[in-house]
Curated annotation (Swiss-Prot):
Cofactor: how bound: Binds 2 magnesium or manganese ions per subunit.
Tagged with keyword Manganese: yes
Species for this entry: Arabidopsis thaliana (Mouse-ear cress)
Sites where the protein binds Mn(2+) 2: 69, 245, 284
Keywords, alphabetical: Hydrolase, Magnesium, Manganese, Metal-binding, Protein phosphatase
Region (Disordered): 301-331
Similarity remark: Belongs to the PP2C family.
Enzyme class of the recorded protein, top EC level: hydrolase
Name of the protein: Probable protein phosphatase 2C 12
PANTHER family on file: PROTEIN PHOSPHATASE
Domain of life: Eukaryota
Length: 428
């Protein structure tokens, strides 16, 4: 019998049930479809719905949609499809609530991409792959990407929002500068006699991309660190289109959306692929995934045509906000149903992407490598903040930490060690 003023502790199981019940009410309905026309057989997709964040409860679910466009063979694309999700989830502590889990995703995605690349390269296979990896948790959409496959969003309010980056050297000046600063050479294919043809490529290797998973023979300045964007849709929902470059080299985002308006996802994906192939023919594998995020009470139908008046509002909402401009934007667009940008970062520097300045500073476990999740023994871990003149000493307040192997990879990706050093050491 309790005394007056005594505080009762609510069991964790009860709290989880309450949270799960709320999530079930809040979660939208997801309807998806995909289509492919193959040329080389190097495009692969991953679709997993109702993955469980809390194992066994059947309610705290999220969905995953991945597109892997391989090159120089399919090994990297297949390996990434089979291992990336597990590597991302391994980087997220198991005791987080829903909001913390979502906040942890951006850094976990970075860790998962780097671990997948590191593990695949240890197999000494030279193929590579682009990755566009989408996680939908409730109304929050998190996208991580390397390469030139893309993901776009058409919110129900209207407009087009690009959720991925294009890492082709031809169009990305910032990436060209990074590659050359790290020791790579950027130029077109030289056919002899001073004649150069084709898109800009990275040499050695001749890859057109600055970021990918795999590509052991190109150099470590071609990094697996993804561009990550995270947005929260309004309760009106929206449509995602995830496609390989076989689509985007032929049609624009607006053309992709217009050619499938009024159609369900499966038919939409087929129409988009046919539209792209009809314009340029089958020059490459052409793959498309369409995902509709819908309110539960709405019928299963495609996203309605965008409202023209919504475009200006959405573009303003997605711009980076300074402390001076944020209040003005909030006053001008104080409407409840708008898309909210939660996170965006595209730096290729692993030390910046794992820095504790980002939300949820305690997401990394002490004495565990932040990338590969192996145990780091006292005295062996390297703080992500450590400079070249700092001693390798474990201190809890200096985390997160990297094991020696992941620190070595970080140094190579950031141009602190040439990729040739690794190849020579592996051949000894």
């Amino acid at each position: 019998m309790s005394t007056k003023g005594e505080h009762h502790t609510v069991p964790l199981s009860v709290l989880l049930k309450r949270e799960s019940a709320n999530e079930k009410i809040d979660n939208p309905e997801l309807i998806h479809g995909q289509h492919n026309q193959s040329k080389k057989g190097e495009d692969f997709t991953l679709v997993k719905t109702e993955c469980q964040r809390v194992m066994g409860d059947g309610v705290t679910t999220f969905s995953v949609f991945g597109l892997f466009d391989g090159h120089n063979g399919s090994a990297a694309a297949i390996y990434t499809k089979e291992n990336l999700l597990n590597n991302v989830l391994a980087a997220i502590p198991s005791d987080l609530n829903r909001d913390e889990w979502v906040a942890a995703l951006p850094r976990a995605l970075v860790a998962g991409f780097v671990k997948t690349d590191k593990d695949f390269q240890e197999r000494a296979r030279t193929s590579g792959t682009t990755v566009t990896f989408v996680i939908v948790e409730g109304w929050v959409v998190s996208v991580a990407s390397v390469g030139d496959s893309r993901c776009i969003l058409e919110p129900a309010e209207g407009g087009v929002y690009y959720l991925s980056a294009d890492h082709r050297l031809e169009i990305n000046e910032e990436e060209r500068d990074r590659v050359t600063a790290s020791g790579g050479e950027v130029g077109r294919l030289n056919t002899g006699g001073g004649t150069e043809i084709g898109p800009l490529r990275c040499w050695p290797g001749g890859l057109c991309l600055s970021r990918s998973i795999g590509d052991l023979d190109v150099g470590e300045y071609i990094v697996p660190v993804p561009y990550v964007k995270q947005v929260k849709l309004s309760s009106a929902g929206g449509r995602l289109i995830i496609s390989s470059d076989g689509v985007w080299d032929a049609i624009s985002a607006e053309e992709a959306l217009d050619c499938c308006r009024g159609l369900p996802p499966e038919s939409s994906a087929e129409h988009i692929v046919k539209e792209a192939v009809g314009k340029k023919g089958i020059r490459d594998d052409t793959t498309c995934i369409v995902v509709d995020i819908l309110p539960l009470e709405k019928p299963a139908a495609s996203v309605p045509p965008p409202k023209k008046q919504g475009k200006g509002m959405l573009k303003s909402m997605f711009k980076r906000k300074t402390s001076d401009s944020s209040s003005n934007i909030e006053k001008e667009y104080a409407e409840p149903d708008v898309v909210e940008e939660l996170f965006e970062e595209g730096s290729a520097m692993l030390s910046e992407r794992l820095d504790t300045k980002y939300p949820l500073c305690n997401m990394f476990k002490l004495f565990m490598c932040a990338v590969c999740q192996v145990e780091v023994k006292p005295g062996e871990g390297v703080s992500i903040h450590a400079g070249s003149d700092n001693c390798r000493k474990l201190r809890p307040w200096d985390g997160p930490f990297l094991c020696a192997s992941c620190q070595d990879k970080k140094d190579a990706m950031e141009g602190k060690r040439s990729s040739g050093d690794r190849h020579s050491s592996e051949s000894d």
